[in-house]
Amino acid sequence: MKNHIIKFSILVFLIFVNACKTEKSNNKENNSSTEERLYVGQKPPGLVPEPFAPGLVTTDGWENCGGFTPNLKEYYFLRKVEEKGEDYKMELVVIENSNNQWKKSVVSPRMGTPFISPDGKTMYLSRKYRERTNNGEWSEIKELEAPFDSLPTMRLTVSSKGTYFFDEFKRDFTGDIRYSRIVDGKYEEPKLLNRQINTGKSFHPFIAPDESYLIFDSKREGGYGDSDIYISFRKQNGLWSDPINLGGKINTKAWEASASVTPDGKYLFFNRNMGSENYENVDIFWVSMQIVENLRPKI
């Protein structure tokens, strides 16, 4: 009798363990399937950067500065389209999910570098912007107020607090990164970030929604070659840490730039020049944000 009880107990235990494994496996498959439906139908990468959506987004041409809406159902990016001879034009393209189908269409000619605000209500286009209307469409192009409407900005990003972080492109092909907070309901005069960030040529800032880190690209001493991607973390005293190079998995001797993070905080996107010095083939890559989190200082 005792042996039967022991055998029965072992059988129940094995059934329980197997059920747990099956449930865990199913959950993992469901999560993977859900993620693939979110990111333009792509399987998410690990710690090694991969071209994003080959053939759909990334081609043997020029694609740049992509970004998702908060619900991950719309992906906007810039594309260069060749015309007759050596002429070309730039377009703002969207890939959006409708009835579980991803469809690509041209939004407009390029009006600036797209950045979607954390709340999804505003699309910033460097010195311009569009607002999401009640019917879900984007408004007509509007100009930012002074002084932002006249600054030579390539990319403007904004935190959940509404703070602007943007670059200022200069005639000598150098650049600085500035910020502007909302004070008493108005944007303050733009201020330069510290000298550690504004060393060399610094462009294309991306501010975390909670302002806990700033990602940007810079060509400076100690890099891998051309422009590299760096991150600076905000310290407990409110100051910014010395910039950290994201390392050899992301940065190469080629030009890397225009980094951003998906609204869910899971993946880092960036650009890499895969062609010659003429930049005829610039691709969009993505990689797990864990590669960045590994650099975060331990408190």
What does each of the following model-derived ranges do?
Residues 22-299:
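Short, conserved micro-motifs composed of acidic
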Residues 17-19:
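C-terminal motif of bacterial Sec signal peptides marking the signal peptidase cleavage site
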